[in-house]
Amino acid sequence: MIDDGRPLFQQIAEQIEGSIIDGSLPEDGQVPSTNELAAFHRINPATAAKGLNQLVGEGILYKKRGIGMFVTVGARDALRFRRREAFARQYIEPLVMEADRLQISLDELKSRLDDRKADR
């Protein structure tokens, strides 16, 4: 899972975000500790801590002193919104621009998307 050119702490943060979005880390649920993440991924604990602290800074996680870090209530919806916006910028906008260049109508584009989704 941790293997691309992006910083490791960022990949840790994104994996935790994914677990929040898919529900495997519920809101108000405790997230794995820095040491657990470091041992699991075979990385430096400081790197794992940086990923967790990034999410604390974004309001996705909160700290309970002496206990650990937990998922903030509302984090799942906030992450879904943020990822949907990023998805639109990264995929939908270029798709629409290319469809315009090729004179593909919105109806045809929708039909092609429906076909692809049905094939899954």
Q: Which ranges hold each PLM region?
A:
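Extreme N-terminal segment that seeds HTH/winged-HTH DNA-binding domains in transcriptional regulators
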Residues: M1-V31, N35-E36, R80-R82, A86-R120
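Gly/Ser/Thr-rich beta-alpha loop segments that engage phosphate groups in nucleotides
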Residues: P7, N53, G68-F70
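Short glycine- and Lys/Arg-enriched binding-loop motifs that mark or flank ligand-binding interfaces
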Residues: S19, S24-L25, T47, Y62-K64
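N-terminal helix-turn-helix
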Residues: Q30-K63
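Short, Lys/Arg-rich nucleic-acid/phosphate-binding segment
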Residues: Q30-V31, K63-R76
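Short alpha-helical linear motifs
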Residues: Q54-E58, G74, E108-L109
